[in-house]
Amino acid sequence: MYIRRTTIRSRQTGQPYYTYRLVESIREGGRVRQRTLLNLGRHFAVPREQWAALVQRMEHLLGGQPDLLPAELDTQWEEAAQRYAAQLIRTRASVQEGRAAEAADYQSVDVDSLELLRPRSVAVEHVALAAVRQVGLDRKLAALGFNGPQQGAAIGTLVARMVAPGSELATHYWLQHHSALGELIDYDFLGLDLMALYRISDQLLKHKGALEGFLYAQERTLFDFEEVITLYDLTNTFCEGTAKVNANAALGKSKEKRSDCPLVTLALVLDASGFPKRSEIFPGNVSEPKTLAQVLGKLTAEHTGNAPTVVLDAGIASEENIAWLVENGYRYLVVSRKRHREFDPDAAVLITQGDALTIRAQRRVNADTGEVELYCHSSQREKKEQGIAELFAKRFEAALEKLAEGLHKKGTVKRYEKVLERLGRLREKYARAAQYYEVSVEQDPASGKTTAITWQRTKPIAETLPGVYCLRTNEADWDEATLWRTYTMLTDLEAVFRSLKSELGLRPIFHRKTDRVSAHLFISVLAYHLVHTIRFQLKAADIHLSWEGVRRELAGQDRVTVTLKRADGKTLHIRKATRAEPRQQVIYDALGLSDRPGRTEKTIA
C-alpha cells in the first residue's frame, strides 16, 4: 500500500487542487495496475515525509500488531493511522456481509493475541437515532435541502445534545472520540470540521418554524392524541460573559438566581401530552404577560376545530391576556392573581387524599364575570406557607435582637430617631411577620438615645386561609376534579424546563451572537422533542424513568473491535456491540429495538 497524490481541476472554477488516495498495486493478466483502497480527500494533512511511516503503521494495525510503532512516524499522526486502518477494515468487511448469519464460522486463532480496540458508546445513541427516524426528522432534513454531510452533522448535533450536552467544541470531541454514532449512520465524524457544527446550528435555526410544525404533526400522528389543552410558560437562562453583541441578552430577574449575568428568555407552548408545539426566544428582561399574544397568535390560524383550553400561571394571567384569549376564541384556566381567598371546608369536594397530600376544592360562579372560580386547599401548600411564615418570624426576631444588642456596643445606632427609622425598615422588610408583634422602644430624654427595645408576639402566626389558592376559568362544564387535574399539568411544563436545563444543556450559554444563542436554545428544544418521544413510549410500557435515568441504565454498552491472529498469519478483525445487559434489554424491548446496535463487521487482513 502507498499514498498517491493526484491533481484535479475544479469543474466550477477551473482551478487545480490535489486529492489523496491510499492505493495498492495488483497484477492482473500479466499487467500491474493500481487499486484504490481509500479516498483520503483533499484535506489530507499528513506531510509527505510521513507517508511511508503512516502506511507501515496501518499495516501493523491491520496485521494485529497494534503495539508496534515505526520510529519514523510522529506520535501526532498515530490517531490518523488508527482512523484510516479502521476505515479500511470497514470497507473490506462490507464485502463479506453477504454470508448467512446462521452459518457457523470456525477459525484457528491464537487466543493470546486477542486485542480489544476502539471502544465507543452506542446504546443511548442507538435509542436516540431510532427516535430521529421514528419521527421522520432525517427525511425532513433532506426535504429542506440538507445534503448528506449536513444531515450527518445535524443528527450528530442533536444526538450529542441528548446524550452528552455541551459546547460545540465538546460535542465535536465526543462525536470523534467517544461515540459510535458515526457507525450507525455511516458518517465519518473524524473528518468533520469543528466549524461545520456552528454552521449546522445556523441552518437548523433557519428552518425553525418548519421543523417545529413538522415534528408536532408527526408526534400527533404517531401517538394519536387530541389537541385539547395548551400549556404556556416561560423560563430564562444565563449567558457567560457580557454578551454585548447579543440583542436578546439583558439583565433581569433570574429564575436560577444568576441575576449577575445577562439573561435570555425561552417561551414554550406544550400540549397536554407534553409535546412542544412552538417555542420563542425573548430578551432576558421581557415582561412575561406581554409575550402571550405574540406566541399564541401564531398558532391561532393553525386551529382547524375548536381552539384548545389554555392553561397559564399567575405571572402571565393578566386581565389583558384573558381578554385576548376570549377575543380569539380560546377557553382558559388560569391561576387567579387576586389576594382575597375564600374557602368553606363543608362545601368543598375531596379531590385526592394521601399521606403526603390532600386536596379539597370548592367551586363557585362569579356573579360579576360569569367565570367559574375554584378555591383549592392543599395540605402540602398549607405546611409550606406556615413554614415560610415561621421562617420570616425568626428572621424578624433575629433582626430585632441584633438591633437591641447594638444599643450596648460602640459605633452602633443608638439615637432614638435613627432606631425608629431602622425599626420601620425592618417592619417593611418583614411585613408578613411584623403584623404579629408589638415592639416597644424606650428613650432616655436627657441624652436622646434609646435605652431598650422589647417585643412580644401578640397573636399566633397564622396566614389567612393558609394553603388556599384560586383558579379561574370559562370552562363552565368541567367539574372540580377535572379543573384541578388540568391545572396541575403546569407542573409537567416546569419539569420540561428542568429537563432542558439539567439534562439537555440549555444552560449556561457560551455564545455571543444573537443567532448562535437562539440556535443553542432551539437545538435543546429539538432534542427535547426526541427525548419526549422516547419517554412517552417507555411510560406506555410502565417504565417511568427520567431522561437522566434512561441514560444511566443504557450506559455501558459499547461497540468494540476484537483482533485475533490466525494460524495462517493473517489477522481476524471483528467489530460489534457488546451484549445488552438485562436492564438495557428491558428498554430495547419497550421501544421495539434490536439489542445489538450496528452491524457485525468481520475482516481478515
What does each of the following model-derived ranges do?
Residues 2-4, 12, 17-21, 29-30, ...:
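Anion-binding and metal-coordination hotspots
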Residues 5-62:
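Short, surface-exposed polybasic/aromatic micro-patch for ligand or macromolecular engagement
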Residues 38-41, 74, 89, 115-117, ...:
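Compositionally biased amphipathic helical and low-complexity segments enriched in hydrophobic
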Residues 45-104:
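N-terminal helical hairpins
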